[in-house]
């Protein structure tokens, strides 16, 4: 009898629960009329359903978030600057600003850091070897303290070109020391290599679904040469080697960046080498060509590619910073653009391409004395007062505008 009563009670409770759940689903349950056992069952079932729904929603959210993470933007920002040419006036002042015990290059770049920081791909031509293996040296055999490298990486530069005529100023030992330093910074460096195997390995980086390859070549190395068995550089007259490298890079990357140290010093006009080899680089697969060496600015333009796309060429970015005593050498450019890739066709285009003028500034009391306040300004912020203080005789707004006349209006951006 007790068993039968117990079974009946269980049956009643179960039926009540089922009826109640049905009522809940219809939105018309009066829980005040349920006994405790039935209410407990209902609450448990309801909580289970809610948890199941929450788990399902949470799972869907995770799946959506994962899908969002897996989809790159296929667009990125890029800046490139010219020769980071560290004369003795610059590093001597940095040593004073560091209290005589360390180098502080903050003043040198403080006015232009805003153009670099936060950029996805930021490229600089490091014109002087960065190494602490020798004492800092100036023209004609440059060597700069590693504090220079620390500063430019801190600014946001993550790609360093070493393809320039001063790369062998301290011989193979100095070059290897500089390569060792850059290896510690976690950035891409190219244009000079520790071995043939290193030279044959194309340097790449991928940003937001866009893969970049970097190659660098120079016209000469000031009469200094390597033995051939160890460290390597590639000269612009080695066209067969350059062609093979660019074609290989074109197969493995969306954007092939080629740094060329070419042009006639202190001349805005293009020379024969520039006009002859640049179209070849584009024909072989170069997408962005960055020109340095002349220490003055030159024109920039799009060139048609064989595949129907367009490459862009900055023929001469001038100096990023220096204390060269020449009015033309005080004017440089920051190249700036957006790189956009169509994920369906893999076609890459450059948008919002700019050439932003900058001014190397320094003051002094005599030609053979120390020059000070060595820094670089955006031309947009270079006041008449600064023109008056600049130590280079004859440096005027008119002389700047003369240099800027070589830049097409569609790209010139004074900002």
Across the structure, where does each feature detected by a protein language model lie?
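Sec-dependent N-terminal signal peptides of Gram-positive bacterial secreted proteins and lipoproteins
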Residues: 3-31
């Amino acid at each position: 009898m007790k068993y039968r009563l117990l079974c009946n009670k269980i049956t009643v409770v179960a039926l009540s629960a089922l009826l109640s759940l049905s009522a809940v689903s219809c939105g018309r349950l009066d829980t005040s009329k349920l006994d405790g056992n039935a209410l407990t069952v209902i609450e448990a079932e309801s909580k289970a359903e809610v948890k199941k729904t929450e788990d399902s929603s949470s799972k869907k959210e995770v799946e959506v978030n994962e899908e969002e993470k897996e989809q790159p933007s296929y667009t990125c920002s890029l800046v490139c600057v010219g020769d980071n040419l560290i004369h003795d006036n610059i590093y001597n002042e940095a040593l004073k600003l560091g209290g005589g015990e360390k180098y502080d290059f903050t003043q040198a770049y403080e006015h232009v850091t805003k153009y670099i920081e936060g950029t996805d791909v930021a490229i600089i031509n490091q014109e002087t070897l960065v190494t602490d293996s020798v004492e800092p040296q100036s023209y004609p055999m440059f060597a700069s303290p590693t504090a220079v490298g620390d500063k430019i990486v801190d600014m946001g530069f993550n790609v360093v070109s070493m393809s320039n005529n001063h790369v062998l100023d301290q011989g193979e030992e100095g070059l290897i020391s500089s390569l060792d330093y850059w290896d510690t910074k976690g950035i891409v460096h190219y244009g000079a290599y520790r071995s043939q195997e290193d030279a044959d390995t194309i340097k790449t980086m991928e940003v937001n679904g866009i893969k970049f390859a970097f190659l660098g070549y120079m016209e000469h190395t000031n009469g200094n040469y390597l033995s051939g068995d160890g460290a390597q550089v590639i000269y612009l007259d080695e066209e067969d080697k350059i062609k093979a490298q660019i074609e290989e890079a074109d197969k493995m990357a969306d954007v092939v960046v080629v740094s060329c140290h070419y042009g006639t010093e202190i001349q805005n006009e293009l020379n024969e080498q520039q006009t002859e080899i640049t179209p070849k680089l584009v024909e072989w697969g170069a997408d962005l060509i960055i020109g340095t060496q002349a220490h003055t600015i030159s024109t920039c333009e799009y060139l048609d590619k064989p595949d129907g796309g367009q490459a862009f060429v900055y023929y001469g970015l001038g100096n990023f910073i220096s204390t060269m005593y020449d009015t033309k050498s005080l004017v440089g450019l920051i190249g700036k653009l957006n790189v956009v890739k169509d994920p369906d066709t893999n076609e890459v285009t450059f948008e919002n391409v700019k050439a932003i003028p900058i001014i190397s500034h320094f003051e002094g009391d005599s030609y053979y004395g120390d020059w000070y306040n060595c820094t670089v300004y955006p031309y947009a912020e270079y006041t008449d007062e600064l023109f008056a203080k600049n130590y280079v005789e004859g440096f005027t707004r008119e002389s700047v505008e003369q240099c800027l006349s070589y830049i097409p209006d569609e790209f010139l951006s004074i900002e």
